[in-house]
Amino acid sequence: MEELQGYLEKDRSRQQPFLYPLLFQEYIYALAHNHNRGLKGSLFYEPTEVFGYDSKSSLALAKRLIIRIYQQNDFLSVVNDSNKNRFVSHHRYNFCYSHFYSQMISEGFAILVEIPFSLRLVSYFEKKEIPKSHNLRSIHSIFPFLEDKLLHLNYVSDIRIPHPIHMEILVQILQCWIQDVPLLHFLRFFLHKYHNWNWNSFLITPKKSIYVFSKENKRLFRFLYNSYVSECEFLLVFLRKQSSYLRLTSFGLFLERRHFYVKIKRLQMQHLILIVVCRDYFQKALXXXXXXXXXXXRCQGKVVLAPKGTHLLMKKCKYNFVTLWQYYFHFWYQSYRIHINQLSNYSFYFLGYLSSLLKNSSTVRNQMLENSFLVDTVTNKLETLVPVIFLIGSLSKAQFCTVSGHPISKPIWADLPDSEIIERFGRMCRNLSHYHSGSSKKQGLYRIKYILRLSCARTLARKHKSTVRAFLRRLGSGLLEEFFTEEEQVLSLILPKTIPFTFYGSHKERIWYLDIIRINDLVNHS
């Protein structure tokens, strides 16, 4: 760390940052190795083996890769079989090295480009603690704002962010951020060489991303995608400038922890409210703006635009988005990916919630002197529900239940100690209760917790070679009750006047926490 600090201090006197030499420094790969070890705390993390190699990194291997990658005929060779691709036997040794080296280089490159933006690294050098306000920015804070603004809007438009994205476009976007030409040249050369056997896999699609990036090289993939997200935000700012003559009043750039970048823009205008909720490809970011007539939000690759105006205004916004994206990113964007719906009859998926406007009508008898008359009033309420179908799909992918929601055992956890199995299932339930505490109705959440509860019991019964009924009869049903009710006990302390709800109870209080800095893992996998 001292060597890295000395290099950065020497580099501050230069006009352009030169990051390429850092690829040959061994401590960069030590940082990447420590980051990979930290990934094991993820909920769905499962270690992957790289063809028998361990996860250690060394400077000699990094230098060897950089030399080998510039050699034309020493990379991967693939032949097409009738059913699948098979690697030539005498090239398998080279493939193993290439696969392993690619992980090292991608992690090292991700470390380099994150150095100027890393809040924790700067705080380490300056011996300062990270302000608590930076750690308490919650993605739940956007929902009270939406509840206050969306009640007076008419239409909502779902806009899918254009895809697929060619990697060359992402590299060109990085040129505006990083001025180190050798580093960018090496990144472009590395991407082209590693994916030259299948050019179709060189695209980012909404459902299936590049395997090498989405699995082994998550960090580099996130950074490339975040750079594209930043450019999309500039388009939103451009639309804001075209709709108002008021200048930008304030602009702040804040860096969130967990290596995700958050841009917070407060744009004050006369006829437009712009709320940009930046959710990176795997994690969250939050940005808000204030005004009085329309709201736009972007989350998980989808832009939600809700102006207070006519249907004609929505069509104009649709035309602007299509034109700007095609002109700015130089690829075709289909207009049918933009759907315009009436807000009063539409539910949109937003940050793990199904949000919609619920109209409540009431009749009041008004008495004035000797005359009386009835007054009908209609009030709007933002309803946030747990997306049960999406969560069941996530549990099915993670092998906790079937597609129809029938609980099953988790085979890969059956070899763990009983306490570890209960702790993992309990942590999932607590995280779900914590994240979806703002739901208007808890019945869907109870169903998800019930699936996890039975899946935990089936996993324990499978381990002990018994049935669920016999296992619970022997140990008691209270074995699985404690960690399922922990979140409810916390709520009973926060709201002492309310009735604390049990596993089968009902609780209609919505609570938005201020410590939620990431989207729940089950929501990410839906």
Swiss-Prot record:
One of its GO terms (biological process) is tRNA processing. GO terms for molecular function: RNA binding. Transmembrane segments: none annotated. Its main location: plastid. It comes from the Eukaryota. GO terms for cellular component: chloroplast. Keywords: Chloroplast, mRNA processing, Plastid, RNA-binding, tRNA processing. It is found in: Plastid, Chloroplast. Usually encoded in the trnK tRNA gene intron. Probably assists in splicing its own and other chloroplast group II introns. Belongs to the intron maturase 2 family. MatK subfamily. This is Maturase K. The gene is matK.
